């Protein structure tokens, strides 16, 4: 699909307004496009040029600028793009993988990955397995934000625990393997107890 070409200048207001009217936009997309219009109304060519530097079409600019701003919430300030022109995801610091369940076989355990931004804002990724069924997501600037490793881990453990608890006693014996689910829950409880004990010192 050919994306709409965008030439940002002080005469672009109608082009931007038409795009807003013709598309079902995410909240952040509409907000960014309204920034374009505000810059035009203020004759702020420098701001238009800055916005234009994030891509060569409406969609690329809004997505790239949104990604950059989400990264700022973690202290990532570098602006860089890959070859197709999409914003490069930043690398989180102090990442660690914590596994829960039967780690002797692939697919029999779940993994929580912790990481922090430059400003020490933490987040987590989660890959979960019920046996044959599962899912997950990686570390991202779109993830939930926490002020410490401990708070991120506590939230992630409770998140994973809730997922596993729902599957206890499931009649779907093909996808939801009870030994794997119960082993994962045991490891989660051990980790939660360990975190609690750390708060006593």
For the regions a language model picked out, list residue spans one by one:
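Short amphipathic beta-strand and strand-loop transition segments with alternating hydrophobic
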Residues: 109-116
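A short, exposed loop/beta-hairpin motif centered on an aromatic-Gly-Thr core
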Residues: 128-163
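Short beta-strand motif preference
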Residues: 124-126
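Low-complexity, serine/threonine/proline-enriched polar segments
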Residues: 169, 173-186
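Short arginine-rich
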Residues: 158-174
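Short, flexible loop/turn motifs enriched in small residues
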Residues: 117-122
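Structural boundary micro-motifs
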Residues: 103, 130, 166-170
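Negatively charged, low-complexity tracts enriched in Asp/Glu with abundant Ser/Thr
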Residues: 2-109, 179, 187-201
């Amino acid at each position: 699909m050919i994306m709409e070409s965008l030439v940002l200048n002080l005469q672009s207001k109608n082009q931007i307004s038409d795009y807003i009217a013709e598309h079902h936009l995410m909240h952040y997309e509409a907000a960014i496009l309204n920034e374009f219009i505000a810059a035009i109304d203020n004759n702020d060519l420098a701001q238009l040029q800055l916005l234009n530097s994030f891509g060569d079409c409406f969609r690329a600019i809004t997505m790239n600028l949104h990604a950059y701003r989400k990264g700022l919430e973690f202290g990532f300030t570098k602006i860089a793009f890959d070859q197709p022109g999409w914003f490069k995801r930043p690398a989180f610091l102090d990442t660690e993988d914590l596994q829960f369940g039967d780690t002797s076989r692939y697919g029999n355990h779940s993994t929580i990955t912790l990481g922090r931004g430059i400003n020490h804002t933490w987040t987590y990724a989660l890959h979960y397995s019920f046996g044959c069924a599962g899912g997950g997501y990686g570390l991202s600037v779109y993830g939930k934000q926490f002020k410490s490793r401990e708070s991120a881990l506590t939230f992630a453990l409770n998140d994973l625990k809730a997922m596993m608890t729902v599957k206890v006693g499931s009649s779907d014996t093909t996808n939801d393997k009870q030994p794997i689910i119960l082993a994962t829950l045991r490891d989660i409880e051990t980790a939660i107890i360990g975190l609690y004990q750390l708060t006593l010192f």
